[in-house]
Each structure stands twice: as C-alpha cells, then as structure tokens.
Amino acid sequence: VTLLPRIDRWPNLFVSRTFSKVYGMAALRCGCLFSSERHMSFVRKAQSPYSVNMLAAMAARIAIKDEKFIQDYVLEVLAAREVLYVEFEKLGIPYYESQANFVLFQAGERAIEIRDKLRDRGVLVRDRSYEIPGCVRVTIGTRDQVERFLKELKEIW
C-alpha cells in the first residue's frame, strides 16, 4: 500500500521509501523521498551534494524496477510471520502482533541470554529491553529463515 499515486492530488504529501527492509539493502543506507516538484525544490536546497553514494544509487534504481520480486517476497514474509505466531503460541511465548517485518517477543529476564545464545548459533536478534523490558526483536525473512530461528530458539528456550 502506498500513497505515491496521490502526490499530485495532495500538495503537502511526502512519501518516503527505505531500501533497508523489503529490498534487503540496509548496508547501503539508501532511501528516497517523493513529493510535489515545489516541495522537492526546497528539499534539494538543503540536501548534501553527495548524500547517496553511486553504488547505492545504482542498486536502488535496479531494485525498484523488480516489482514482482518485491511482491513475492512480501507475500513470503507475511506467510512466515504466521508460522512464527503459530509456533510462539505452541511454545507459550508471549509476543506482540506486528504489521511490519519484525516481531517482538517476551523473553523476560532471559532476553540478553537468548540474544547471546542465538548469536552463538548464527541467528541474530536484537535485545529491546531498554525500550520494552524483556523483549527481543526478530526480523521475519523467508520461511526457511524463520524455521531456522525457531529450531534454534526451541533448543535454548
């Protein structure tokens, strides 16, 4: 869902896109901003002349053209998220439902331990206890990635 087609209808609308999530290009630190020509002229005045490196710009141009890949990937992530929810329910792990490509689950006092043990097994999650005590954030990727995460989590839970 995007409001990009509405930019001409709503003069104060800005739409931003990140290439970090669905496109899997977080290391390139690339995103883009869309608005009316009038608003973009103000943005350009404040923009750094080299705000995006050439490699990131080229990768973004190529990635944005492959709409089918993105649609397929989003559907796969949605299905994988449901698998994750079902398994969390079976394991009795409290979690927060999400509309994003990540889920927070409650690990209590073991949050840092869980993060570290998963890291030792090659699975990276983020401890979010400083924001929500006891919470761990897991990014949802493909079904294979979610199943790998669940396999490792079950062994240490």
Give the residues covered by each predicted segment.
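Short hydrophobic/aromatic beta-strand micro-patches
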Residues: F34, L104-Q106, T139-G141
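PLP-dependent aminotransferase class I/II
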Residues: N12-F88, I93-Y96
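PLP-dependent enzyme catalytic core of the Aspartate aminotransferase-like
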Residues: D116-L124, S129-W157
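Nucleotide-activated donor-binding/catalytic signature segment of Leloir-type glycosyltransferases, i.e.
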Residues: P5-L13
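Conserved PLP-binding catalytic core of the aspartate aminotransferase-like
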Residues: V77-L78, E82, V86-R121
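Short acidic/glycine-enriched loop/turn segments that link adjacent beta-strands
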Residues: A27, Q99-A100, E131-G134
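Short, flexible helix/strand-to-coil boundary loops that buttress conserved ligand/catalytic motifs
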Residues: I7, V43-Q47, V74, F88, ...
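Conserved PLP phosphate-binding loop immediately N-terminal to the Schiff-base lysine helix
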Residues: V1-L4, Y23
